[in-house]
């Protein structure tokens, strides 16, 4: 038996906590035996004094075990349970293609995703643009779709990781969100509660990323890789570029359209293709579905080219309540804005740099993102045909096309887009889509 205040005192004094002490405190978060003030004090003590790797693993597994841990044993799946998670960005539509692609290669992908907040879009918000799609199905339906289709992308259910829900809301209000130890536990407890065999982690870097610097992103990637592997889940983190919009668009319905165009081969943005393939190939390698990257990429290209991945996306949508002909007739179902109009730069030259965060916030001002949790969204609005860094820009080349519901909203977004995309006299140096892979062997 421990006292919460003694655990806080120990961490305040910079000492390491035992797994039993961490387990006790997390249990108290879940049962309300630990007060809000004590949780806030604990968060601040960790923020200033940090945790060693053993403490991080203990915190992550205690939070994972605070609620239901999914069990796939009874379903008799004939392949690995694999997933990916992203720290979030702008135009990050990867999950919509990656899930069906991995399933088409023999994996099972029970992806529990989140909603957008601030400048980053949320995977669930994109699916909410699809009429009838249930982002909060019963656990029976979730398991049925995972088994029969190979992938189901849904929202977090109430009985998964309740400790994180309470802890995170208090961290958000007490300025302790930025702790690497606490971020690691928050992200991984949710993913590990899905009982995965393998996880590919997408840690964004740049002006649209969650972490402020490359160094901070790398530190988070290393922490996640070490803790996840320490907790028994094979994990690799990729550091990927978010200094520009990842897809050619940002929003909800517009990103669903781009995902379907990608799966069917109608259009594949080269940057989006590279990051999607990198993450998906890593999932296949970790899950034992390919023996090297060349083989993994060949398998993924095959399921894209033969239509299998697109077919699986369609089956997932219909299995979770969406239209059966969604892939073939998506334009019939996706909402469309009143105003769809290009925006032009005031100067000519090259797209030199982008404040990706500001472009994400432009989508929020259009009504496509949240200023606070619970805000209603307009799924039709957003940006399309966003230029890529290095593109030649002149008076006849739009830097983006804005989808808005009113002239006032269009004008506000137009000003934001012009401010966020900087035109230079020369093209910038090309940066890689994937900066680094951080595998267990690299730690």
From Swiss-Prot:
One of its GO terms (molecular function) is 1,4-alpha-oligoglucan phosphorylase activity. SMART domains: PYNP_C (SM00941). The keyword Nucleus does not apply. Its EC number is 2.4.2.4. One of its GO terms (cellular component) is cytosol. Belongs to the thymidine/pyrimidine-nucleoside phosphorylase family. Homodimer. The enzymes which catalyze the reversible phosphorolysis of pyrimidine nucleosides are involved in the degradation of these compounds and in their utilization as carbon and energy sources, or in the rescue of pyrimidine bases for nucleotide synthesis. This is Thymidine phosphorylase. It comes from Shewanella sp. (strain W3-18-1). The lineage of its organism: Bacteria, Pseudomonadati, Pseudomonadota, Gammaproteobacteria, Alteromonadales.
């Amino acid at each position: 038996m421990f006292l919460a205040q003694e655990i806080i005192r120990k961490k305040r004094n910079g000492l390491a906590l035992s797994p039993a002490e961490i387990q006790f405190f997390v249990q108290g978060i879940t049962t309300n035996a630990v007060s809000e003030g004590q949780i806030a004090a604990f968060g601040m003590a960790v923020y200033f004094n940090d945790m060693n790797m053993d403490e991080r693993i203990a915190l992550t597994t205690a939070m994972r075990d605070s609620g239901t841990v999914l069990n796939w044993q009874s379903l008799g799946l004939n392949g690995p349970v694999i997933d990916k998670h992203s720290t979030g960005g702008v135009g990050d539509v990867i999950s919509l293609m990656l899930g069906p692609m991995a399933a088409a290669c023999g994996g099972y992908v029970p992806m529990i995703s989140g909603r957008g907040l601030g400048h980053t879009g949320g995977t669930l918000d994109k699916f909410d643009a699809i009429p009838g799609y249930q982002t909060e199905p019963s656990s029976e339906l979730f398991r049925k779709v995972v088994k029969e289709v190979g992938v189901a992308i849904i929202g977090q259910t109430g009985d998964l990781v309740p400790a994180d829900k309470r802890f995170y809301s208090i961290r958000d209000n007490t300025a302790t969100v930025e702790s690497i130890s606490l971020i690691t536990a928050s992200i991984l407890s949710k993913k590990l509660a899905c009982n995965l065999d393998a996880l590919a982690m997408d840690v964004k870097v740049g002006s649209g990323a969650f972490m402020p610097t490359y160094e901070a992103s790398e530190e988070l990637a290393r922490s996640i890789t070490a803790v996840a592997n320490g907790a028994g889940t094979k994990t690799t983190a990729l550091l990927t570029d978010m200094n520009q919009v990842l897809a050619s668009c940002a929003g909800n319905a517009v990103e669903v359209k781009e995902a379907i165009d990608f799966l069917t081969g109608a259009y594949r943005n080269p940057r989006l293709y590279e990051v999607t393939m990198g993450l998906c190939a890593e999932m296949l390698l970790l899950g034992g579905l390919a023996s090297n990257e060349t083989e993994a990429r060949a398998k993924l290209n095959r399921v894209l080219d033969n239509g299998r991945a697109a077919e699986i996306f369609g089956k997932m949508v219909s299995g979770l309540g969406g239209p059966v002909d969604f892939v073939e007739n998506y334009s019939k179902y996706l909402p469309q804005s009143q105003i769809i109009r290009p925006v032009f730069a005031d100067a000519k030259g090259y797209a030199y740099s982008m404040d990706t965060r500001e472009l994400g916030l432009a989508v929020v001002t259009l009504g496509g993102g949240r200023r606070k949790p619970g805000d209603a969204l307009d799924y039709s609005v957003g940006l399309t045909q966003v230029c890529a860094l290095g593109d030649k820009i002149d008076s006849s080349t739009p830097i983006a096309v804005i989808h808005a519901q009113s002239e006032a909203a269009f004008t506000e977004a137009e000003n934001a887009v012009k401010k966020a995309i900087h035109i230079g006299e020369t093209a910038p140096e090309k940066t890689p889509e994937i900066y680094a892979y951080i595998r267990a062997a690299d730690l």
